[in-house]
């Protein structure tokens, strides 16, 4: 059952009201948003520029990769829940489409507002997708226990706080964070975790639908592979052209490879009977791209990237195995997707790695490239040690914004008119979607199984089973 008639009537009205939200956004775009000089036909040709020099040709390939990651990678990574696949992909689509518009306005007012207008181009598109990524990270922490109206309100608040935090870090404190270990991963993770703590529901610990099935975990691996392949582009998307962008992609590439090996090694070590856990592989193998987010543009060295990636993969795997149960039982945080292990802890490690590498920066190591990586050091306004301290202070600022914002967001999402799904309907697609009338679940052990062969539930054939329609 999808719920009572009154609840169904409320849902019928909630999402159509999005047209008013889209209309308000469109009005703000009409008043404030304009093409920048690299996009406007008259301004570009007035400068007698060659089309080959347009920023589009340098940034758009990275934008394509980032865009695919946000809409395909994040969405499919969350389809592991056995009865929440439509919602995982569909609400990712909805949230990202709204967040990229709203963040264009928020970031525009903070970063590119001059002459009374916000000026947009391919860089603003990438920045908007970055912000949408942070929102989707937070979504992962509350996946399955929030409705679309609640999620949109979460995005409305989080995008504003994301923009303010980013402005404080990058423009006021002069923090360097090319791949977003601080601004994207740490902020998004702890915003979502505090939000989840405020929305804690003790009865959900008993839900049988919080786990994956063979086919749902397989689909989630599609998201993992998408993110794994394209993450060097994500970290390098807005770094300085030339050596900086090249170095960022290289460091991310090696860190991802090392985190994957670390994940496989630790998963087998801590797994039952030495077997791999697909949850570890889906998630912890990606921790390498988070841990080098801050330092990927710096002279981390290939060895440093490998070491950092391996450490992140092992820490993330151990987090899924040991810390997630503690997080729920002791701290009342129901972290559905394990964002603390994939984004939170690796994000903090990434910030600390950035502190170390920034503190070791010298003119000899960077040469003329110091200006593009650490402009304040190159100009003599800061020492390397001072830059490192600002990097560390940026972590505390981020945690403050994330914690306060997540707490406030949790209180807002508890408002009764937002139609939070009841405990019995959490992690269920049919609450918000016209789901098919049958689902897939594992069969009992087949009669032809070899006697004495170790039984593996994940490898059982699949059968069609009538959907559980009880409220």
From Swiss-Prot:
InterPro entries hit by this protein: Ammonium/urea_transptr (IPR029020), NH4_transpt_AmtB-like_dom (IPR024041), RhesusRHD (IPR002229)
One GO BP annotation of this record: ammonium transmembrane transport
Tagged with keyword Ribosomal protein: no
Pfam families recorded: Ammonium_transp
Annotated TM spans: 14-33, 61-81, 86-106, 124-144, 149-169, 178-200, 218-238, 250-270, 281-301, 303-323, 345-365, 392-412
Cytoplasmic face residues: 1-13, 82-85, 145-148, 201-217, 271-280, 324-344, 413-471
Catalysed conversion reaction: NH4(+)(in) = NH4(+)(out); methylamine(out) = methylamine(in); CO2(out) = CO2(in)
Chain spans, region Disordered: 437-471
Protein's cellular compartments: Cell membrane; Basolateral cell membrane
Top-level taxon: Eukaryota
Signal peptide: none
Extracellular side: 34-60, 107-123, 170-177, 239-249, 302, 366-391
Motif (Basolateral sorting signal): 427-430
Interaction with ANK3, as annotated region: 414-422
UniProt KW keywords: Ammonia transport, Cell membrane, Glycoprotein, Membrane, Transmembrane, Transmembrane helix, Transport
PTM entry text: N-glycosylated.
Function field: Ammonium transporter involved in the maintenance of acid-base homeostasis. Transports ammonium and its related derivative methylammonium across the basolateral plasma membrane of epithelial cells likely contributing to renal transepithelial ammonia transport and ammonia metabolism. May transport either NH4(+) or NH3 ammonia species predominantly mediating an electrogenic NH4(+) transport. May act as a CO2 channel providing for renal acid secretion.
Family, per entry: Belongs to the ammonium transporter (TC 2.A.49) family. Rh subfamily.
Subunit structure: Interacts (via C-terminus) with ANK2 and ANK3; required for targeting to the basolateral membrane.
Protein name per its UniProtKB record: Ammonium transporter Rh type B
Organism: Pongo pygmaeus (Bornean orangutan)
Lineage: Eukaryota, Metazoa, Chordata, Craniata, Vertebrata
């Amino acid at each position: 059952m999808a719920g009572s008639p009154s609840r169904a009537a409320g849902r019928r009205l909630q999402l159509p009201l999005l047209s008013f939200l889209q209309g308000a956004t469109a009005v703000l775009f009409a008043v404030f948003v304009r093409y920048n000089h690299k996009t406007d036909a008259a301004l570009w040709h007035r400068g007698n520029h060659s089309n080959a020099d347009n920023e589009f040709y340098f940034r758009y390939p990275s934008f394509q990769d980032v865009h695919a990651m946000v809409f395909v990678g994040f969405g499919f990574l969350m389809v592991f829940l056995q009865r929440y696949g439509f919602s995982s992909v569909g609400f990712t689509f909805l949230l990202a489409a709204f967040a990229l518009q709203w963040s264009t306005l928020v970031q525009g007012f903070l970063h590119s507002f001059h002459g009374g207008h916000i000026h947009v181009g391919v860089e603003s598109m990438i920045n908007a997708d970055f912000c949408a990524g942070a929102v989707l990270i937070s979504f992962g922490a509350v996946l399955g226990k929030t409705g679309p109206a609640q999620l949109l309100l979460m995005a409305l608040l989080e995008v504003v706080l994301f923009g303010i935090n980013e402005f404080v870090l990058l423009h006021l404190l002069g923090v360097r964070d090319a791949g977003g270990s601080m601004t994207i991963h740490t902020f998004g993770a702890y915003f979502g975790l505090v939000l989840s703590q405020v929305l804690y529901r003790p009865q959900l610990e008993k839900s049988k639908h919080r786990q994956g099935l063979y086919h749902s975990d397989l689909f989630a691996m599609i998201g993992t592979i998408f993110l794994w392949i394209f993450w060097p582009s994500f970290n390098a998307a807005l770094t300085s052209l030339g050596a900086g962008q090249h170095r960022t992609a290289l460091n991310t590439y090696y860190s991802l490879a090392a985190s994957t090996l670390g994940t496989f090694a630790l998963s087998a070590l801590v797994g039952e009977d030495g077997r791999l856990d697909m949850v570890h592989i889906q998630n912890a193998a990606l921790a390498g791209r988070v841990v080098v987010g801050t330092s990927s543009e710096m002279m981390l060295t290939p060895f440093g990237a490998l070491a950092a990636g391996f450490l992140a993969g092992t820490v993330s795997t151990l987090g899924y195995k040991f810390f997630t149960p503690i997080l729920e039982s002791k701290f009342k945080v129901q972290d559905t997707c394990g964002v603390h292990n994939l984004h939170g802890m690796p994000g903090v490690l990434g910030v600390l790695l950035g502190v170390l590498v920034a503190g070791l920066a010298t003119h000899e190591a960077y040469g003329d490239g110091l200006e593009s990586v650490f402009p304040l050091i190159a100009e003599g306004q800061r020492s390397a040690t001072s830059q490192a301290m600002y990097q560390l202070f940026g972590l505390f600022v981020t945690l403050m914004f994330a914690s306060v914002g997540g707490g406030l967001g949790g209180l807002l999402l508890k408002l009764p008119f937002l139609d939070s799904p009841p405990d019995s309907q959490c992690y269920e697609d049919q609450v918000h979607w016209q789901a098919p009338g049958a689902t897939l679940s594992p069969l009992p052990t087949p009669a032809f199984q070899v006697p004495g062969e170790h039984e593996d539930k994940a490898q059982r054939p699949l059968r069609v089973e009538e959907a559980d329609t009880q409220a």
